[in-house]
């Protein structure tokens, strides 16, 4: 009988030890892992070209005041999107760069104002940018109310014809146009779809 009691105590002690282990495991905190991502289309390389040469500036050279007033001074150039990976389309938006503004009263116009700091600075002169090789045809890329210009990418590249046209500032009169340096900086925002 003593052997049975001793065996019972050993089994009971082991059961308590085992229950104690399970209790410890039951109080261990668990961690959840949540992975969140947004799978997006690839992007493209972008560059501006004028006459098949890569440029960073669209240089009008010398322009005469009557050309500005008449709006007859324009330059064509291209935005090239290349090496596009899984990108069927994009939207271009043109916005004034830091330190640049829109033309018109209080900067409310749709052309890009002269932001030159040179002396003398051309007064009452602005530049329009158009989504075609010919100004005043196609879609104007507006300054104040920046609009999205859709581009379809076929294959891995696309050439987007654009043009810039010097004009009289929409908030000024012809007599306000003066000679001097002109510079207007803008930034293309490209959203891939």
Report residues per predicted region.
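Bacterial N-terminal signal peptides
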Residues: 9-18
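Mature extracellular/passenger domains of Gram-negative fimbrial/pilin and adhesin proteins
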Residues: 2-5, 21-193
């Amino acid at each position: 009988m003593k052997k049975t009691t001793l065996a019972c105590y050993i089994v009971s002690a082991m059961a308590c030890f085992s229950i104690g282990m399970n209790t410890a495991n039951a109080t261990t905190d668990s961690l959840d892992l949540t992975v969140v991502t947004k799978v997006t289309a690839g992007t493209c390389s972008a560059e501006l070209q004028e006459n098949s040469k890569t440029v960073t500036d669209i240089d009008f050279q010398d322009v005469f005041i009557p050309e500005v007033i008449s709006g007859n001074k324009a330059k064509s150039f291209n935005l090239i999107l290349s090496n596009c990976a899984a990108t069927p389309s994009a939207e271009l938006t043109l916005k004034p760069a830091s330190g640049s503004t829109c033309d018109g009263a209080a900067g409310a116009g749709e052309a890009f104002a002269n932001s030159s700091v040179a002396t003398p600075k051309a007064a009452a002169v602005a530049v329009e940018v158009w989504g075609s090789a010919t100004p005043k045809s196609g879609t104007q890329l507006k300054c104040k109310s920046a609009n999205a210009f859709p581009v379809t990418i076929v294959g891995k590249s696309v050439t987007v014809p654009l043009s810039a046209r010097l004009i009289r500032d929409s908030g000024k009169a012809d007599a306000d146009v003066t000679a001097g340096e002109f510079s207007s900086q803008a930034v293309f925002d490209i959203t891939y779809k």
